[in-house]
Amino acid sequence: MPDRRPVIALAALIALVPCAPCATAAAQDVTLAQATEMLRSTSHDEIQTGIQSLGLLGSPAGVEPLAARIRDGLAPDLLEAAIDTLTVLGRAEAGPVLFELSTHRRPEVRLRAVQAIAACRPRGADRALMTALSDASPDVRGAAARGLGEIGATAAIDSLFLAFDRGVPEAGPALGRLARPEHVTRVLESLGRVPFDQMRVVLTELLGRRDVPSRTKLDVIARLAEMATPEIGTFLQEFVEASAAPANDPVRRAAEDAITRIAR
């Protein structure tokens, strides 16, 4: 599925501007040089139009003037708009300024910065997102966990397990995306210790992956069958109903057998 966050960020950026249709029309007529010059203005509205123009232009050359203006200081709403524009541009060159913003005093700014890091995927993104797993804000911690899953940061597995154990539920789907067969034992150790509604997303991701061997999936289903709770029966039923595997697929058959045993 294509990443829709840059589209959403652009829509949010436009929505921040008063009289959005008028401002958008004006921004569309601005060149890169003009937008860059607007960022040097002391006028809130001019800076706002300059930021929006750079997002609409979509040029990688917009990253440097945006980063410079961010470092010079911006009003809170303009800072958020500038980060959203960097997200729209999706360029790795934005990494240094986004790393700086990921430690900003305001959690709203840190959240946007973490989301932008995941979208831009600069070098060092995995380290920055792993650090953000310990942020004081639960929203930032959750965004960091989601980002690690999205960028495929397999080096973050241990950090994600720790975050999951410490109550960051968003680490669950990331673990489901990133766990390798050798990590599955650790995933299964969480069953019965972590609420199953949080484990459900981990298992759904894990069982749905094509790169996970059938043998590993069979081990997961065998452990679920041992626990044999009604909610596990429901989960397995939903898994079978959503599966596109043929009737003779060993994983599907194991799930169906487990459903029958749990129902007795």
Predicted regions, residues:
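Bacterial N-terminal signal peptides
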Residues: 9-21
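Boundary at the C-terminal end of the N-terminal hydrophobic targeting segment
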Residues: 22-27
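Amphipathic alpha-helical scaffolding segments comprising HEAT/armadillo-like alpha-solenoid repeats
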Residues: 28-38, 59-71, 91-103, 122-134, ...
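Short inter-helical turns and helix N-cap capping residues of alpha-solenoid HEAT/ARM repeat scaffolds
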Residues: 42-43, 74-75, 105-106, 136-137, ...
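N-terminal, post-signal-peptide region of Sec/Tat-exported proteins
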Residues: 43-87
